[in-house]
């Protein structure tokens, strides 16, 4: 059956179109800097928000109207697969992502859970044979079930550690079977509420042991996808061990795991950590650890993970600025880890939301490309740090200066003069480039 019978394929119609079911800026075939938009952006649909989210929150029950909700159990799981590939085709997206429990219900035993997963993976595999949409990444849900109340790999209960390992083992087998580009680890319960009852050293050691086991098993079965860690500072756990990129990077370096992992950066998680989206992307990029992106945005007035669809053009531009400087995302992509608002409960809202996000990143791509092509910020930055290309600055950079030499130099200095950072000027330039790309020429006349 058709789950979205009144919606056709979403096509590019240009910025002057008033068709709500059309892309205004995302043209998958348009080339930007030698690559098509589709190749640059590598969009992905998040299975959990799009097909299992029901709109419930701590103050209200689910209210989403979904054509597949008349089913239950495995029939519901199968209907969601059918609806998913219909939406993928109509949006023309190249990728999707899922947790294990998104695609199939848990059974009474682990064996039953495996059986359910195998049946749905069979179905997904068949759909993928005739679909352009591939698996960007999958992961194991190690946070929802009560067994994970104290964590998974960091649980105080070794039985839980073993159960979590079994779920990831199965997840890696599914990843290999479906040709996943990546496999993600997000430690929603890997952290602590209070140090009064926590052996932090043991928990971190065990988390590292868990990751090493995953690396070993991936090698054993021949899964060559990229491993990704998704940092988040809190929620649901008060203090999570993968707080931000810098914290998670220190963990990977400490335990000899850096060569096996990169980061999946989520915009809203950066917000919760007190960072900008572009900050987390920059830290990952300069350390060679930028792997993939969960494309969403948070509400700056709220203190939790709101997972809104990305429509902030400054954020998408500065994100693409980092991604382009990274040479792209390689095997990663832009996954819409985003949900429609509770008040946007009709099926067509799923399309409006993805169109908005895809158009927003298309604008960001084009603006970022022009900024880099014109070297707008690079020229200013080079001039700002020019003192390190000559004289004493060059000696500092080349490692030929020491405290004795620097003291002698400083004693001969007169009054030190700095130059302006020109922040307001740079923001004006950013606005100018944004308007030139995003506002149709007729509207500017």
Swiss-Prot record:
Query: Which residues are involved in binding Mg(2+) 1?
Result: 230, 266, 294, 337
Which reaction(s) are listed as its catalytic activity? alpha-D-xylose = alpha-D-xylulofuranose
Residues recorded as binding Mg(2+) 2, renumbered to this chain, are 266, 269, 305, 307
Alphabetized, the UniProt keywords read: Carbohydrate metabolism, Cytoplasm, Isomerase, Magnesium, Metal-binding, Xylose metabolism
User: Which positions are catalytic residues?
Assistant: 99, 102
**Leader peptide range in chain numbering:** none
* Protein family membership: Belongs to the xylose isomerase family.
User: What name is this protein filed under?
Assistant: Xylose isomerase
Protein's gene: xylA
């Amino acid at each position: 059956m058709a789950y979205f019978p009144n919606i056709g394929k979403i096509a590019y119609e240009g910025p002057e179109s008033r068709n709500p079911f059309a892309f205004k800026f995302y043209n998958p075939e348009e080339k930007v800097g030698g690559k098509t938009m589709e190749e640059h952006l590598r969009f992905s649909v998040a299975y959990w928000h799009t097909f299992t989210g029901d709109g419930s929150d701590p103050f209200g029950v689910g209210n989403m109207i979904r054509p597949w909700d008349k089913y239950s159990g495995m029939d519901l799981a199968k209907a969601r697969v059918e609806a998913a590939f219909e939406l993928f085709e109509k949006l023309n997206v190249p990728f999707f992502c899922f947790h294990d429990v998104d695609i199939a219900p848990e059974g009474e035993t682990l064996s039953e859970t495996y059986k359910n997963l195998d049946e749905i993976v069979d179905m997904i595999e068949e759909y993928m044979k005739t679909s352009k949409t591939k698996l960007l990444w999958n992961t194991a849900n190690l946070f929802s079930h009560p067994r994970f109340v104290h964590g998974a790999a960091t649980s105080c209960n070794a039985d839980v550690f073993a159960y979590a390992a079994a779920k990831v083992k199965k997840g890696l087998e599914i990843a290999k079977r479906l040709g996943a580009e990546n496999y993600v680890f997000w430690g929603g319960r890997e952290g602590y509420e209070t140090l009064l009852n926590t052996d932090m050293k043991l928990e971190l050691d065990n988390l590292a042991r868990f990751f090493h086991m995953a690396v070993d098993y991936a090698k054993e079965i021949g899964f060559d996808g990229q491993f990704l860690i998704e940092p988040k500072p809190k929620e649901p756990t008060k203090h999570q061990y993968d707080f931000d990129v810098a914290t998670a990077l220190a963990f990977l370096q400490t335990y000899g795991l850096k060569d096996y992992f990169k980061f999946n950066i989520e915009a809203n998680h950066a917000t919760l950590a007190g960072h900008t989206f572009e900050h987390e992307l920059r830290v990952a990029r300069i350390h060679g650890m930028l792997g993939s992106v969960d494309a969403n945005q948070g509400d700056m007035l709220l203190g939790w993970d709101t997972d809104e669809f990305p429509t902030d053009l400054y954020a998408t531009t500065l994100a693409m600025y980092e991604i382009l400087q990274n040479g792209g995302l390689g095997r990663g992509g832009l996954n819409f880890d985003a949900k429609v608002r509770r008040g946007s409960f009709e099926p067509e809202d799923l399309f409006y939301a993805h169109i908005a996000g895809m158009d927003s990143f298309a604008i960001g791509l084009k603006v970022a490309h022009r900024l880099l092509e014109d070297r707008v910020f690079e020229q200013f930055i080079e001039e700002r740090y020019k003192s390190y290309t000559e004289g004493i600055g060059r000696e500092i950079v080349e490692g030929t200066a020491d405290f004795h030499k620097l003291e002698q130099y400083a004693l001969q200095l007169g009054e030190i003069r700095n130059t302006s950072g020109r922040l307001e000027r740079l923001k004006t330039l950013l606005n100018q480039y944004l308007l030139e790309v995003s506002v149709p020429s007729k509207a500017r006349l």
